[in-house]
Amino acid sequence: MSFENKLPTPLENNDAKGHMVCTLNKTTDARRAAETLSIAFSNSPAFHFICKKILNIPLAEKVPTRTITTDIISPFLDSPYGEISEVNTFDAVAVWSLPPHVPKARSNDAKFNKDFIDDLNARVKQVIPNGINYYYLFCIGKNLNEKGIRGSVRTIFEEYKRRADEENCAIVLEAIAEHAKSVYEYFGFRNYMTFKYGECEVDSNGNCDPNGEGFTAYLMIYHKDGNKVLKE
C-alpha cells in the first residue's frame, strides 16, 4: 500500500543545488528503513489504521509509528520475494513484493480483509491479463525532515518501472490520498478501483467512530503498454 506521506510533486527532482539525485540501493537494514517510513507516515491516520488491522492491534491503542512500521515491513525482509530499496542514505524508502510475491498478511477482521485484500486481488486479476506478472508496491515514504534532498521518490519509480518494463510486468499499488494519486498518475499509473475501508469504525482523521466515514483509497496499476493490455 502507498500511504499519504506528502510525496514531492513531480517537478521536485533536483536537490537544492540543482544536482540530480539518483543513488538507489537495496537494503536489509530494517531499523533505518523503518525510521524513514515512520517519519513519512507519522501524521497519517490511514497508515496507523491499516497497520493496526494487519497487526491485530486495537484501534484505540496508541502505538509508536516506529514500532508498527518495523513490524509491518519485517515479512518483506524475511521473504525471498520481498525487497526494500532506499535512495540517498534512506532519504526515501520503498517496500516491494516481487513475483511470485510475499503472502499478504491477513487481519482477524473479515471485513477489512474483504475491503482491502480480497476485493482488490479480484480486481487486479480482472485488469491484468494471464501471463503478465506484477510488482506490488506495499509502501513508499520520504524523510520529510530532509527538505534539501529532492528526486528520491522519482528515482525509485524510474528504476522499478525500468525493471518492470524489461520483464513485461505491471506495477500495482494502493494510494490513499488525492495528492498521492496525482503523483502516481504523473508516473503513468491509472486508477482501476476507488474503494472505501474503515467505514463505521473511524472518521477520516482515524478517530474511533461507529458512524465514521472511514477512508477512501485507489487501486492503481502501471504497465508500459497499459492502454493496450490492461482491461477496464
Swiss-Prot record:
Which N-terminal residues, if any, form the signal peptide? none
The answer on whether this UniProt entry bears the keyword Nucleus reads yes
Enumerate the subcellular locations listed in this protein's record, separating them with semicolons: Cytoplasm; Nucleus
Keyword field: Cytoplasm, Nucleus
Can you cite an annotated GO cellular component?
cytoplasm
Q: What is the designated name of this protein?
A: Uncharacterized protein YDR391C
The reply on keyword Nucleus is yes
Which InterPro entries does the entry mention? N-acetyltrans/Recomb-assoc (IPR052564)
Instruction: Quote additional remarks.
Output: Present with 6020 molecules/cell in log phase SD medium.
Residues that span the membrane, as ranges: none
